[in-house]
């Protein structure tokens, strides 16, 4: 696996069939946690320090966004220090439009600082519709006046944001983050019902507690936050990236090898581990490492993605490739993001994967997309003989699927668009080359 030939695009890799991938990978901190911690640190009255920071593109983008606001950001190896300072401005420049979804999370913190804020249109992976309605509705519940324009979202408030009671229509991770960040400095008590409780959400809540926030998690997806007058800086170490850990375990299994993954605690991987076991994988687990192999081959499975503690939606892309190497007919039902399933399917189909897509709910209970036209279920027939191809990957998660599919395929592949991988995986090229 190498950068592609000189006449190929700069963001392309040439991938030859690898044979069994074997070795050890120690994952860094969670890509889905680090950027939210960086936003939280903006609200502190003193610097915050975060350790075990992954070397991913989203950290670079968020660093640029924060610096454009006047926030000090210093990255030293895998440690980042955020220094809020007194000169923070309330508007994220339009040049950061569409790069990732972090700007929308800045609305609450900027409103606390300036009583007004503007963020440009957000971006992120191509995984179907990802409207900002839940964020906007939550901010309005706190008393903000919010206006959506073609360029972005503008908000203002007269005085201080006020605690409120919010019940999310769906346990959205992003909306839960917006509420936690906004409620921490709001006047009075906020009660958030039907909240997301993913490990990265709990990490954010714990970091805010270290900064002085008063946050309680109650049974039944309920957060209670009592707003405080001021937050201070804090120090924390990020937990390992569970998506990256699963991806490398799957890379070993897909190629008939065995990858040993460290840096991600077992409790963050419970549903991933049980899913691999159902497919016939043998897991070796201790306090430091998780490894998986399948000496007797892989079995087909029916599974649906879900909010935590269910099977993580980000895990479905590498699972697609694993299903092509499992004996029998597998079913995958995506219930979190409409149309997300199209993108990894498109990449794997280009390499010969036998995949049929459906608009109906298969492999699990009926979901919120059951009466829509969204493609959100797939049937995957295995074992498929994948073949090398020239493919362009559309997003981060589908990108890793393309790379590991190319590793097990017959013949050479060129994978374009690997900048998507570098946005979310920690040093992916050198990590894969080490296996």
Show which residues each predicted segment covers.
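Short, structured segments at the rim of ligand-binding sites
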Residues: 1-435
């Amino acid at each position: 696996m190498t950068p592609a030939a000189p006449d190929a695009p700069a963001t392309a890799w040439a991938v030859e069939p690898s044979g069994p991938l074997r070795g050890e990978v120690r994952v860094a901190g969670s890509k889905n946690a680090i950027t939210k911690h960086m936003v939280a640190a903006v609200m502190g009255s003193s610097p915050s320090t975060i350790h075990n920071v992954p070397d991913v593109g989203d950290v670079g983008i968020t660093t640029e966004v924060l610096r454009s606001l006047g926030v000090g950001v210093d990255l030293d190896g895998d440690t980042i220090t955020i220094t809020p300072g007194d000169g923070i401005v309330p508007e994220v420049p339009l040049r950061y439009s569409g790069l990732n979804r972090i700007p929308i999370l800045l609305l609450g913190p900027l409103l606390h600082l300036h009583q007004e804020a503007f963020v440009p249109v957000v971006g992120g992976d191509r995984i179907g519709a990802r409207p900002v309605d839940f964020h906007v509705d939550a901010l309005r519940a706190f008393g903000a006046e919010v206006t959506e324009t073609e360029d972005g979202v503008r908000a203002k408030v007269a005085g201080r944001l006020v605690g409120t009671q919010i019940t999310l229509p769906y346990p959205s991770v992003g909306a839960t983050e917006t509420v936690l960040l906004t409620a921490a400095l709001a006047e009075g008590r906020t009660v958030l019902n039907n909240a997301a409780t993913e490990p990265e959400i709990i990490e954010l809540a714990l970091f805010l507690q270290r900064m002085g926030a008063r946050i309680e998690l109650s049974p039944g997806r309920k957060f209670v936050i009592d707003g405080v007058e001021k937050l201070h800086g804090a120090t924390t170490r990020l937990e390992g990236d569970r998506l990256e850990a699963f991806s490398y375990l799957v890379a070993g299994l897909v190629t008939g090898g065995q990858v040993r993954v460290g840096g991600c605690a077992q409790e963050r991987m419970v549903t991933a581990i049980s899913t691999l076991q159902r497919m016939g994988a043998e897991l070796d687990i201790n306090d430091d490492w998780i490894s998986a192999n399948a000496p007797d081959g892989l079995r087909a499975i029916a599974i649906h993605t879900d909010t935590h503690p269910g099977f993580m939606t980000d895990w479905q892309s590498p699972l697609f490739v694993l299903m092509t190497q499992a004996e029998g007919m597998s079913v995958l039902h995506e219930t979190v993001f409409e149309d997300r399933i199209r993108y990894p399917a498109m990449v794997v189909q280009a390499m010969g994967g036998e995949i049929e897509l459906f608009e109906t709910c298969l492999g699990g209970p009926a979901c919120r997309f059951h009466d829509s036209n969204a493609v959100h279920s797939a049937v995957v027939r295995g074992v498929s003989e994948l073949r090398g191809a020239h493919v362009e990957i559309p997003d981060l998660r589908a990108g890793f699927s393309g790379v590991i599919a190319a590793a097990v395929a017959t013949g050479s592949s060129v994978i374009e668009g690997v900048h998507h991988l570098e946005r979310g995986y920690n040093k992916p090229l050198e990590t894969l080359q080490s296996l």
